Regions:
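Non-catalytic, largely sequence-independent nucleic-acid-binding elements associated
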Residues: 20
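Aromatic-rich, lipid-facing transmembrane alpha helices and their immediate juxtamembrane interface loops
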Residues: 24-315
Length: 315
């Protein structure tokens, strides 16, 4: 594929920025929020949408557009902004659909729990053996385990799998509490399978392309131990089931009527991660990702649009 001449890049960037402005104005004129929506609800949605927009811009400017010869300005402290924007997008989406209390519980408990699990697993080899992180992983470390690992699990695994599983299993953004424990256990298992599917792309990229950590032992699958994926299924099934119990215990509920702008945030993030991993061009990884990430994402989009088509018009 031919590269764009250097002299044409500023013009292309200018066209890109004009397109972004035009898109934002179009969204505004189409009334992103219902007219009767309270200001607080609008603010929560706006922050969530803005956060995912920043995340997508970073992914495009860093991973995808350079392959096409288009180079956009990089943000300062981009690795930190990327993690921060993903975390904010996840938190505000949870806030809108599950309430502030449950959103805070998810952010704090999931981030802390998975950091501890990563620390123990890395040192004790709980699933698949021990591993050690390198300086390529962004952010500071404590005891050899990066601080941002907990937030990464929260935004990139827990958040995306939670909403996608609800859509795939029940065709809704938030599952019904009826017969909750049977349904919750099944949805939690599907969520863990989605997490495993994400990690089947994420780990090969982070280990082989980004060199962010090294396994003491591996397997023929890009050097990632198979036990690592078994661990994801077991741990995430239990954790997501426990979170659904806490939702019931603390009466989680939506702030208002479902709005597509905030409902599509987890799917946008999921698809963006697929593109990011696929852009590394590791042999065979994109084919794997088409089944483990792209297919569930497409099915979830279809279920999401079907869900909104059934909703009554909002004034």
């Amino acid at each position: 594929m031919g590269r764009i001449p250097a002299g044409d890049i500023p013009a292309r960037e200018n066209i890109f920025y004009q397109s972004v402005v035009t898109f934002c104005l179009s969204v505004y004129t189409l009334e992103l929020f219902p007219e009767t929506m309270p200001a607080r609800n609008r603010a929560v949605i706006a922050v969530g949408v803005l956060s995912i927009a920043v995340f997508v811009y970073i992914m495009l400017s860093t991973d995808l557009l350079p392959l096409l010869g288009v180079h956009l300005p990089l943000l300062p402290a981009q690795a930190y902004v990327k993690m921060g924007s993903a975390t904010l997008a996840a938190f505000f989406c949870f806030w809108y659909f599950r309430g502030l209390q449950n959103a805070l519980i998810g952010l704090i408990l999931i981030s802390a729990l998975f950091w501890v699990l990563e620390f123990l697993s890395g040192h004790l080899g709980m699933f698949g053996g021990t591993y050690s992180y390198t300086d390529a992983f962004p952010g500071p470390s404590v005891g050899g385990t990066p601080v941002f690992l907990g937030l990464e699990h929260y935004a990139y695994y827990f958040f995306m799998s939670y909403f996608i599983a609800n859509l795939l299993v029940d065709g809704v953004i938030v599952s019904s509490p009826e017969s909750w424990w049977k349904r919750a256990l099944f949805v939690s298992f599907i969520s863990s399978a989605i997490v495993m599917g994400i990690d089947m792309m994420a780990d090969p990229v982070q280990v082989n392309a980004f060199q962010q950590w090294h396994w003491a032992g591996g397997s023929p699958y890009f050097g990632i131990p198979y036990g690592n994926y078994v661990g994801y299924i077991l741990i995430y099934t239990f954790v997501l089931f426990a979170f659904k119990y806490l939702e019931l215990r603390f009466h989680a509920q939506e702030m208002g009527t479902p709005v597509l702008a905030i409902a599509c945030v987890p799917l946008i993030m999921h698809f963006s991660r697929f593109l990011e991993y696929a852009s590394t061009e590791l042999p065979g990884l994109t084919i794997v990702g088409c089944f483990t990430m792209l297919l569930p994402c497409i099915l979830a989009w279809d279920r999401l649009f079907a869900y909104f088509r059934k909703l009554p018009p909002v004034a």
